[in-house]
């Protein structure tokens, strides 16, 4: 008998990719995610390639994964893809410490983030 197949979590003309455990704060990651939101994928790749932000290479990798998912898994046309959503969230925070004066201990928080990118196939009007 077996289980039923899980329904798609996105529309018929969409695909997505997730990147987890990115070693940056969500606030810094959102700056780069806002850079590509709503753009055609060719323009988004160009913007991320020449961005000076350190995390932009990880965002580029996630975007290329979403494009590959759209092409290989869902049969979408790569030339008509647009970044419909790019959002980030908070992941775990690695806690470290630094000795301070008078026997105290200063907390150092090293945040991690996660990123989700959805691409959508649109017509020639985009």
Swiss-Prot record:
Pfam families per UniProt: Ribosomal_L22
GO-annotated biological processes: translation
UniProt keyword rRNA-binding, yes or no: yes
The UniProt record lists the keyword Endoplasmic reticulum: no
Swiss-Prot/TrEMBL keywords: Ribonucleoprotein, Ribosomal protein, RNA-binding, rRNA-binding
Subunit structure: Part of the 50S ribosomal subunit.
Functional summary from the UniProt entry: This protein binds specifically to 23S rRNA; its binding is stimulated by other ribosomal proteins, e.g. L4, L17, and L20. It is important during the early stages of 50S assembly. It makes multiple contacts with different domains of the 23S rRNA in the assembled 50S subunit and ribosome. The globular domain of the protein is located near the polypeptide exit tunnel on the outside of the subunit, while an extended beta-hairpin is found that lines the wall of the exit tunnel in the center of the 70S ribosome.
Protein name: Large ribosomal subunit protein uL22
